[in-house]
A protein has these predicted regions:
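Core nucleotide-handling region used for phosphoryl-transfer chemistry
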Residues: 1-497
Length: 497
């Protein structure tokens, strides 16, 4: 989970409507609050939400809360321990990230006349400058959610790979900082980004044991590994030996979902999916949030006082073998068939085919949906498909309404500047994504959606970018502020550090 600050320019600087000493500006389309010293076109460093500034950087720029002997604040606004960048509202206006002048990095270049401005240019991304750590992904430190879990889940830690062809799913980068990745002729699709825990299952060559010669036995060597086709399941970073223990106290909720693919995957297939809802003890898979902390009455009126990312699941719903009966056809009568809501559910977002030489073929989204329909599993909801024209405009089909229309960033937003065909496609794609990235979750309909994922279909390798809405970013920040532990994916990042 890489995190960077971006050297960029501050645009659309304007007065804050509710604060005389503040201004608003835009970075990558995100609104930031700045003081009156900032100006249009100023070059600086933008730190997106969900990052953590280093102690050195925050101290050098007087960002940490500090009180004098009389209890008066003489420092900044950041918690000295967390130092996290989060989405907030200041006097009723969005502030989505942190923008600082480029001079904030001058201390990294003491021997360079002119400081950071002589070294860094617009477009650079930074996490370390001249040997000085600047920022990293913010991950709350702590133990697993269930301190009585009796240890973490057992994962395979051997010199020989258990499933050498079982590939991890790469992190999905932010759309706003990768607009240049889009080109005329690209085909795209926009799907729902779901807030859950990642899982993957493959039908691949799996380690079954070792062939030991007499020499191996004498010298106590393991011998030559023996592989045969079998099913293997893991989280984003680990391969699971079993479903005991783990971050959630038990990984039992994962088991039924992995078994669903047994007898259904073709040889060489790997399926990547999001698990949402609740664990077998009824705890939410992802953190909950008190919506009143947003100080937004309209949000509370729309989504209630508590956000639980349930996606239509029930904490007391069916699980285990009962859950399998929901998905696997059987000969039971309608009277005995399970009708309760699931305790957790899965949504597939990617599938691959890997041959025995390790060559990976990426399934197109349409073929992935075809295979999932054959297997009886759900895929992430599809919002729209489109193609970028040579003009840079996006011809989009809204799959919710079957409406066909064109999305573009027009001349009026560029104040008369000529259209840049190199950059316009990405801007058009971002605008298209923002048609769908906010509002109630289309699955459960009781909480805000996280955002969307924009995938470029015509690339040989999986190429996709996420775009989260502001309300979710604020919720995510509040959840992390009060968290005693990172979420599942972030917990694994800590383990891998």
């Amino acid at each position: 989970m890489a995190y960077y600050g971006f050297v960029t320019t501050l645009k659309n600087v304007r007065p804050h409507p509710n604060a005389d000493r503040l201004q608003l500006g835009d970075c990558f389309g995100n609104t930031v609050c700045v003081n009156l010293d900032y100006y249009e076109g100023q070059v600086g460093v933008y730190f997106p939400t969900d990052g953590q500034l280093s102690v050195e950087f925050a101290t050098q720029n007087n960002l940490l809360r500090l009180k004098d002997e009389n209890g008066n604040n003489i420092g900044g606004y950041m918690d000295p321990d967390k130092r996290n960048v989060k989405a907030i509202k200041l006097r009723g206006e969005k502030s989505d990230g942190l923008f600082l002048p480029l001079s904030c990095l001058d201390y990294c270049y003491p021997d360079v006349y002119g400081g950071a401005a002589k070294v860094l240019k617009v477009g650079n991304r930074i996490d370390i400058c001249n040997g000085h750590e600047i920022c990293k992904k913010y991950i709350p430190k702590g133990n697993s959610r269930n301190s009585n879990a009796g240890g973490t889940s057992r994962t395979r830690k051997r010199k020989v790979a258990v499933a050498p062809l079982f590939s991890e799913h790469a992190d999905t980068e932010q759309l706003a900082y990768n607009l240049s990745a889009f080109r005329p002729g690209d085909e795209i699709e926009i799907t729902l980004k779901m807030h859950g825990t990642s899982q993957r299952t493959g039908y691949l060559p799996v380690l079954k044991g070792y062939k030991r010669t007499l020499k191996d036995r004498i010298f106590r060597k393991e011998g030559e590994p023996i592989y045969d086709w079998g099913y293997v399941t893991g989280t984003r970073r680990t391969v699971l030996d079993d479903y005991e223990g783990g971050y959630y106290g038990s990984n039992e909720f994962r088991e039924a979902h992995s078994k669903l693919f047994e007898g259904r995957l073709w040889r060489g297939e790997t399926v990547y999916y999001e698990v949402v809802g609740f664990t077998t003890n009824g705890s939410p898979i992802m953190g909950v949030c008190n919506n009143k902390k947003l100080n937004d009455k309209d949000f509370v009126k729309r989504y209630g006082e508590i956000t639980t990312f349930s996606y239509g699941c029930d904490p007391d719903g069916c699980h285990g073998t009962e859950l399998l009966k929901m998905f696997i056809p059987n000969d039971e009568s309608e009277e005995t068939r399970v009708v309760r809501e699931p305790q957790s559910d899965i949504y597939v977002y990617r599938m691959t085919m890997t041959n025995e030489d390790g060559d990976v073929v990426e399934y197109t989204p349409d073929f992935m949906r075809y295979r999932c329909e054959q297997m009886g599993v759900k895929t992430v909801p599809l919002f729209a498909k489109g193609k970028i024209a040579m003009s840079g405009l996006v011809n989009l089909i809204d799959y919710r309404t079957e409406e066909d229309f064109i999305v573009a960033e027009g001349d009026e937003t560029r104040e008369g500047d000529p259209l840049s065909y190199e950059y316009l496609p990405g801007e058009s794609v971002k605008k298209a994504a923002e048609i769908f990235y906010d509002g109630p979750d289309p699955v459960g309909k009781i909480h805000v959606r996280e955002g969307v994922v924009v995938r470029i279909i015509n690339r040989p390798k999986f190429t996709a970018y996420k775009h989260k809405n502001f309300s979710f970013k604020v919720l995510e920040g509040i959840i992390k502020e009060s968290a005693t532990a990172p979420d599942m994916e972030e917990a694994q990042e800590v383990e891998n550090e």
